[in-house]
Amino acid sequence: MSKLLETLEEEKTVEQKPRSQEEEDHQDSSKKEELLESLCTPTSSDHKIPEVETCPPPPRKRPREISLTKKTRLSKDLRFFEATDVGSQEVETLFVHEPNHVRKKRRSNSA
């Protein structure tokens, strides 16, 4: 521990030696240059992002699948109307077209 303290004190005394202004300026400028060089963006090809030659195709939409429960429910409903006479008649009554001609009233332009 004492050796460590002695070396630190020696470094302080070395740093405290009076220097000429030119030497200090030169050392400061060299430190600044080193700092600037270490802060530069790397420009080598290893550090660059590679260019994309062709764009990938867009993702395709997946076809919608009806779940099995919906399929079975639909098929059961259809079988009911096909199997019974009452069911088929009921369906026909829903879609029977009765010819009731509805006359639309025309507006008169005279007011």
From Swiss-Prot:
Keywords: Cell cycle, Nucleus, Protein kinase inhibitor. Expressed at low levels in roots and stems. Expressed in the root vascular tissue. One of its GO terms (cellular component) is nucleus. Residues 1-66 are annotated as: Disordered. It comes from the Eukaryota. Residues 10-35 have a biased composition (Basic and acidic residues). Disruption phenotype: Larger leaves with an increased cell number. GO terms for molecular function: protein kinase inhibitor activity. Its main location: nucleus. GO terms for biological process: regulation of DNA endoreduplication. The keyword Thylakoid does not apply. The keyword Cell cycle applies. It is found in: Nucleus. Interacts with CYCD2-1. Interacts with CDKB1-1. Cyclin-dependent protein kinase (CDK) inhibitor that restricts cell proliferation and cooperates with SIM and SMR1 to promote endoreplication during leaf development. PANTHER family: CYCLIN-DEPENDENT PROTEIN KINASE INHIBITOR SMR13, CYCLIN-DEPENDENT PROTEIN KINASE INHIBITOR SMR2. This is Cyclin-dependent protein kinase inhibitor SMR2. It comes from Arabidopsis thaliana. The lineage of its organism: Eukaryota, Viridiplantae, Streptophyta, Embryophyta, Tracheophyta. The gene is SMR2.
